[in-house]
Swiss-Prot record:
Disulfide bonds: none annotated. It holds the Pfam family Ribosomal_L20. The gene is rplT. Binds directly to 23S ribosomal RNA and is necessary for the in vitro assembly process of the 50S ribosomal subunit. It is not involved in the protein synthesizing functions of that subunit. GO terms for biological process: ribosomal large subunit assembly; translation. Keywords: Ribonucleoprotein, Ribosomal protein, RNA-binding, rRNA-binding. One of its GO terms (cellular component) is ribonucleoprotein complex. PROSITE patterns: RIBOSOMAL_L20. This is Large ribosomal subunit protein bL20. InterPro entries: Ribosomal_bL20, RIBOSOMAL_L20_CS, Ribosomal_protein_bL20_C.
Length: 119
């Protein structure tokens, strides 16, 4: 039975790894062991930050809605309570976009939410 040599597969693995480490600084771009660690850590950061991105966008939308609503004399929590009572089914992303780009439309949403709040 012939001996199996793994030089080709090792070279392919190393090449794929170094391609992933392209653009890194120092020995992280051309030393196999260090590049492997750097690529693995980059993957961990990417996985974590895909989750963080959702949180930070939601926080941004809330800040934008809050700023627009406070100009009309409500707090964010009062506004959201009024939105729920009024049965308005717009999510925060859409409301933040309305607050930024369509002030008249968002003003009507605020008026509906105010009307739904108990006096």
């Amino acid at each position: 039975m012939p001996r199996i040599k793994r030089g080709v597969t090792t070279r392919q693995k190393h090449k794929r790894l170094l391609d992933q480490a392209k653009g890194y600084r120092g020995r992280r771009k051309n030393t196999i062991r260090i590049a492997r660690q750097a690529v693995e850590k980059a993957g961990q950061y990417a996985y974590r930050d895909r989750k963080v991105k959702k949180r930070s966008f939601r926080a941004l939308w809330i800040q934008r809605i809050n700023a627009a609503v406070r100009a009309e004399g409500l707090t964010y929590s009062q506004f959201m309570h009024g939105v729920k009572l009024a049965g308005i089914e717009l999510d925060r992303k859409v409301m933040a976009d309305l607050a930024m780009n369509e002030e008249a439309a968002f003003k009507s949403v605020i008026d509906q939410a105010k009307a739904a709040l108990p006096a």
